[in-house]
Design a protein with these regions (language model features):
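Short S/T/G/P-rich N-terminal loop/turn motif that feeds into the first structured element of a domain
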Residues: 1-71, 75-102
Length: 102
């Protein structure tokens, strides 16, 4: 295990006219216990959010704040499916890490 041993990944799609608004909000957002955040553009309006956390407890503590944040940006997002809604989230322990930034 690594010192930073928990991550969450969220797939989402932005409405074409809301990209700027979304990034205005997300660039001002931080969560206690999240040590790194990445957003990859995977399609024209498709994105993948990756958060690295100090621990599973850290993300659990911030869950209410993350839900409040989602409520703030939900209107900027397209529904992925009726089952998923506007996000497709997963999270878990980091079991392998290769990189130069320790």
């Amino acid at each position: 295990m690594t010192a930073q041993n928990f991550m969450n990944v969220v797939r989402f799609k932005l409405k074409s006219d809301c990209v700027y608004n979304y990034f205005e909000v997300i660039d001002k957002t931080s969560f206690e216990g999240m040590t790194q955040r990445y957003i990859a553009k995977t399609g024209d309006y498709d994105y993948c959010f990756v958060g690295i956390w100090k621990s599973a407890e850290a993300i659990a503590t911030q869950r209410p704040a993350m839900i409040a944040h989602l409520d703030e940006v939900r209107g900027f997002m397209e529904e992925l499916s009726p089952e998923l809604g506007v996000t497709d989230p997963v999270s878990g322990n980091i079991v392998s890490k290769v990189g130069y930034h320790d």
